[in-house]
């Protein structure tokens, strides 16, 4: 019998997910005027993805701007009349409030026009589109999915008996079906409580995917290291004999069997 380094790894099933994912939709309703992305391509944060026709909004802006100009002039005149005590404070306040209201309307329409250019909220890979130029869309219309696959998360559940051994920044290895390649990740988030329904603790790790070999939605076979024993004595399970107060094994000493009481730490498959 001799001591050796023993790594106690826990084998778990996990799910690979995009670090960032969003459904691209328009905040305004209207006819799609132009589409500026290629399906399945990489897009940059802030890049215009598609444009909704804004002619009606621009016409409304011209009308609102004209009203705002008239209201500004009325407010200016009302101020002069107030200084000459030709009108009451209340009449001036009404003119001033009307001016502020028209200013707000102009700002609102400009904000609506800005929303007709739908931009990527972050850099990533955009999926298949469900619209074409000329399609009438509303805020409920799903245009495409945008995912950041440069980094992926691996979510897995750990049985509650191991919960106290899970630490942040723990390095994990994992593999996916169809390949023997090993990938690496780091635990960055741990659920603060054990799920009562499953008696498991949910853990999440993050991994680089710069080469794009991994896909969100796939399963992962996770190897989670629990601890490392530098001077472990490894004994076959069948060599351990249960006794009333614990366990024992038999060793050979000077050609004779000797009974030794042992304390089992970790069992492997």
Segments from the language model and where they lie:
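Short beta-alpha junctions and helix-cap segments that line functional grooves
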Residues: 140, 234-238, 261-262
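Acidic- and glycine-rich mobile interface elements
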Residues: 206, 210, 245-269
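Surface-exposed patches in structured soluble domains
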Residues: 15, 29-36, 42-48, 112, ...
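Structural microfeature recognizing short secondary-structure transition sites
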Residues: 127-128, 176, 180-248
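N-terminal beta-strand block that forms a small beta-sandwich/beta-barrel module immediately after a flexible targeting
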Residues: 1-29, 188
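Short, conserved beta-turn/loop elements at beta-strand boundaries and strand-helix junctions
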Residues: 3-6, 21, 191-196, 242-245, ...
């Amino acid at each position: 019998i001799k001591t050796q380094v023993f790594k106690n790894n826990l084998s778990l099933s996990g799910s690979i997910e995009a670090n960032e994912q969003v459904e691209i939709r328009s905040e305004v309703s209207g006819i799609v005027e132009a589409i500026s992305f290629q399906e399945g391509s990489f897009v940059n944060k802030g890049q215009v993805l598609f444009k909704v026709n804004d002619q009606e909004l621009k016409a409304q802006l011209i009308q609102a701007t004209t009203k705002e100009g008239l209201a500004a002039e009325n407010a200016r005149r009302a101020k002069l009349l107030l200084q000459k005590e030709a009108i009451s404070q209340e009449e001036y306040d009404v003119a001033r409030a009307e001016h502020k209201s028209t200013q707000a309307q102009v700002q609102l329409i400009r904000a609506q026009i800005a929303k007709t250019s739908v931009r990527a909220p972050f850099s990533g890979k955009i999926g298949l589109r469900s619209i074409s130029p000329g399609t009438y869309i509303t805020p409920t219309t799903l245009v495409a999915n945008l995912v950041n696959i440069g980094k992926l998360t691996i979510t897995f559940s750990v049985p509650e008996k191991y919960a106290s051994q899970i630490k942040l920044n723990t390095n994990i290895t994992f593999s996916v079906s169809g390949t023997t390649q090993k990938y690496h990740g780091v635990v960055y988030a741990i659920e603060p409580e054990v799920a009562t329904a499953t008696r498991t603790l949910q853990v999440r790790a993050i991994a680089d995917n710069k080469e794009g070999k991994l896909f969100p939605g796939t399963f992962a076979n996770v190897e989670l290291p629990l601890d490392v024993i530098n001077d472990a004595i490894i004994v076959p399970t069948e060599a351990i004999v249960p006794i009333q107060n614990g366990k024992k094994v038999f060793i050979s000493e000077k050609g004779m069997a000797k009974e030794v009481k042992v304390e089992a730490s970790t069992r492997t498959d």
